[in-house]
Every structure is written in structure tokens, then in C-alpha cells.
Regions:
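N-terminal segment of the mature soluble domain
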Residues: 10-66, 98-102, 139, 144
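Extracytoplasmic/periplasmic, Sec-exported soluble proteins
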Residues: 24, 28-36, 82-86, 121-133
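Surface-exposed short loop/turn segments
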Residues: 47-48, 58-104, 108-123
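Compositionally biased, intrinsically disordered linkers/stalks adjacent to structured regions
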Residues: 125-148
Length: 148
């Protein structure tokens, strides 16, 4: 645990983020890009001792939001209301300059949420996108530094 942690922090002190653009082939929702980028940076700032570098960090994250769309799921478990599945996918490139074996190239992370088709997407979008972003950001964090 702690000894391993200390070794990591002696080699790895900084992290840099490139903006993840929203290149969704499906829907494009304006706020999504900044919501995602903020959430991604926040988790590293809050849960590690890494300092943010403008560029060339010991750890580097880049990528893009590749998809945001909805799928009609048909009848829900209640037997009559139909459900819509909202889906979001992010592609991530990760560079660990102190341990290149941990690098990731184009790794995909996804999340989905369902809502009732009787609801307007605009009424639930903010909350559901926030939840999906949180889930994806946690997946990315776990895939990059959680083993510390």
C-alpha cells in the first residue's frame, strides 16, 4: 500500500489533460463537452496528489467523446411503458511516462441510463448525462491510477 504509493509519487508528480472534444456521431448536446472535461480533471485533482501541468505531464490523458445516442428499448419491466436507453462512449489515450506498460491507446469507456419514453429527453438529459459522465470518469480513473 503506502510504500508502493510513495514510490509512485516520487516518479509521477504531474498530469496533463488535452480537451476531449465531442465528436458524437449521434446526438450533440452543447454542455456535454465541458461537463465531461471538468469532471475528468476534478477526479484526479481531488483523489490524487498529482499537480496539473499544461502539457507534457508525467501522466497524459487525451481522447474524445465518440458517441451519445438513444436506443428505444421497447416495453419496460412494468409491461406497458416503453423505455429509452441513453448511451455515451468516450475514447481515451493514456500515457504514463514512468511506466509505458500502462499506456492505453483508443480504449473505450461507456455508460448508459434508461428513462421512460413518455418523458422528454430535455427534461432528464442534464441529470442522466451527469450520471453517465460520473460513471465513465470513474472507469477511466480506475483504469489509470486506481492500482496506486
Amino acid at each position: 500500500g503506502d510504500v508502493y504509493k510513495r514510490q509512485h509519487y516520487t516518479k509521477v508528480k504531474t498530469i496533463s489533460f488535452e480537451n476531449f472534444p465531442n465528436r458524437s456521431a449521434g446526438f450533440v448536446w452543447g454542455p456535454m463537452e465541458s461537463m465531461f472535461n471538468t469532471a475528468l480533471q476534478d477526479i484526479y485533482m481531488q483523489q490524487t496528489r498529482l499537480k496539473q501541468a499544461k502539457r507534457g505531464g508525467d501522466l497524459q490523458l487525451s481522447g474524445e467523446i465518440t458517441n451519445y445516442d438513444a436506443l428505444n428499448k421497447g416495453i419496460g419491466s412494468d409491461g406497458y411503458s416503453s423505455m429509452v436507453e441513453l448511451r455515451m462512449t468516450v475514447r481515451v489515450n493514456f500515457v504514463n511516462n514512468s511506466n509505458p506498460a500502462e499506456n492505453m491507446n483508443g480504449q473505450q469507456f461507456s455508460a448508459s441510463r434508461e428513462y421512460n419514453a413518455n418523458q422528454q429527453l430535455s427534461a432528464v438529459q442534464d441529470e442522466l448525462v451527469t450520471q453517465m459522465i460520473k460513471e465513465i470518469v470513474e472507469q477511466i480513473f480506475n483504469a489509470t491510477v486506481a492500482n496506486w
